[in-house]
């Protein structure tokens, strides 16, 4: 484990580098305008520090790259699939495993098997693609995160927790037969990368059992959640990360995972089912026409091998300590400068409170997105909005959803940037904050009907 000295440095050596392109302010003003003021539509070559997402952006280890050379590209029965199954079974304790090309592929396969039209999926706080797949399957996603998550200024160790009283009351009101399943997202991205405590998971399991409802996990950042439990929850300080993960998932019936986060790979996802063989059979039947045969699920053998090795590597406590503390390093710099963030910082990103940063910009004009545009113009930094733009419209009313939390997410890729990059990011945010009164909101030029933030085009409100 780290001592105070070694905590200051990354616990790895850099073997390969990629040059970063430096653009001028004038070029960035032109480029973002050409992209319709949508940072998703920028070319990556025109981005200096890319904090858009931690999904698929990790730097793989030499051990993972070595595994890539052992890819068994057989259509059926790949040895890399067998290795992946063994690793998942060992870490999570789930019997049945199928790979998918990424997390949303897992949701697209699994959710229609679990959701009947009009049923509710109760989560701590669903992310955008998850909520979209719930709605595409005919369901309704309901967020049940604790009220403390909405208070960005004050400390709470587990802001990703379910409000268990609200959860049970909702089930009583709507009837258990109208609940498709409960989905625990660990860590809770939309709340600020915030962890869920073991005690809360246990209580959600108790409620699920009481009403005969299944509990699934969105396990994209499972190891980061386990690290927070070890650091913050009494009784777990002396347990290994692997032991904590095993206990967490013992309370679930299955999980979907974007392996592009904590499995430290650039592509891949998983569906794992604890012991329901009948559901596993249905998953396989759905998987084949959509993702590919059961033993590859849209992935090359080499990618499954890298995923298996990444799942093992992410359990290293030294890595996790550095990872979480790099996020904290950036968050502390911003907080010390008076910039409003979700406090404490979460596992994969620093979340700036856009409504407090730009109180003069109405939420319908996407204040957090406006900050993202200004960060790119200021320093070539690409962040992402997790707020009203991402939330989309209510399918019943057609009105913009206006979430209580409206964030700029500074998402830190794993094993990619040093704290020198974080210093640049902090300075850029401070400069934007200093001229915040001059920043205007945005409106649509083109608005797609689904997941609009990916391909929308916008313009400043004059």
UniProtKB/Swiss-Prot annotation:
GO terms for molecular function: tryptophanase activity. Its EC number is 4.1.99.1. The modification N6-(pyridoxal phosphate)lysine is found at residue 261. It comes from the Bacteria. It catalyses: L-tryptophan + H2O = indole + pyruvate + NH4(+). Keywords: Lyase, Pyridoxal phosphate, Tryptophan catabolism. Pathway: Amino-acid degradation; L-tryptophan degradation via pyruvate pathway; indole and pyruvate from L-tryptophan: step 1/1. It is an enzyme of class 4 (lyase). Its cofactor is pyridoxal 5'-phosphate. Homotetramer. Belongs to the beta-eliminating lyase family. This is Tryptophanase. The gene is tnaA.
């Amino acid at each position: 484990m780290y001592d105070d000295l070694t905590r200051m440095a990354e616990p790895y050596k850099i073997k390969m580098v990629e040059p970063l392109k430096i653009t001028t302010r004038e070029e960035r003003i032109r480029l973002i305008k050409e992209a319709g003021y949508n940072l998703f539509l920028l070319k990556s070559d025109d981005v200096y520090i890319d904090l858009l997402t931690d999904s698929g952006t990790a730097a793989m280890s030499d051990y993972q790259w070595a595994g890539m050379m052992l890819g068994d590209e057989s259509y059926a029965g790949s040895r890399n699939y067998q290795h992946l199954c063994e690793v998942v079974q060992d870490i999570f304790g789930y019997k049945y495993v199928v790979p998918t090309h990424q997390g949303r592929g897992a949701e697209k396969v699994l959710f229609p098997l679990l959701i009947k039209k009009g049923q509710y999926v109760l989560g701590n706080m669903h992310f955008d693609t998850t909520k979209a797949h719930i709605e595409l399957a005919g369901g309704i996603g309901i967020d049940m995160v604790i009220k403390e998550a909405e208070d960005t200024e004050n400390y709470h160790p587990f802001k990703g927790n379910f409000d268990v009283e609200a959860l049970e009351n909702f089930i009583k009101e709507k009837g258990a037969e109208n609940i498709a399943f409960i989905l625990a997202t660990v860590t809770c991205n939309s709340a600020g990368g915030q962890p869920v405590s073991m005690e809360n998971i246990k209580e959600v399991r108790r409620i699920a059992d009481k009403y005969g409802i299944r509990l699934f996990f969105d396990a994209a950042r499972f190891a980061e959640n386990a690290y927070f439990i070890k650091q913050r929850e009494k009784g777990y300080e002396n347990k290994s990360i692997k032991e904590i993960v095993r206990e967490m998932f013992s309370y679930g019936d299955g999980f979907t995972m974007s392996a592009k986060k904590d499995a430290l790979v650039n592509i891949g996802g998983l569906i794992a089912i604890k012991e329901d063989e009948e559901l596993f059979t249905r998953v396989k039947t759905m998987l084949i026409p959509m993702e590919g045969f059961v033993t590859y699920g849209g992935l090359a053998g080499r990618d499954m091998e890298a995923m298996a090795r990444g799942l093992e590597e992410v359990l290293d406590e030294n890595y996790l300590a550095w990872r979480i503390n790099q996020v904290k390093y950036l968050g502390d710099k911003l907080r010390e400068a008076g910039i409003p963030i979700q406090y404490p910082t979460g596992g994969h990103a620093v979340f700036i409170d856009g409504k407090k940063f730009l109180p003069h910009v109405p939420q319908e004009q996407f204040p957090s997105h406006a900050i993202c545009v200004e960060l790119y113009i200021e320093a070539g930094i690409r962040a992402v909005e997790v707020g009203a733009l991402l939330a989309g419209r209510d399918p019943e009313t057609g009105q913009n959803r206006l979430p209580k939390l409206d964030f700029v997410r500074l998402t830190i890729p794993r094993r990619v940037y040093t704290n020198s990059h974080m210093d640049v990011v902090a300075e850029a945010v401070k400069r934007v904050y200093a001229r915040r009164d001059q920043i205007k909101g945005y409106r649509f030029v083109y608005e797609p009907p689904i997941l609009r933030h990916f391909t929308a085009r916008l313009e400043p409100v004059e």
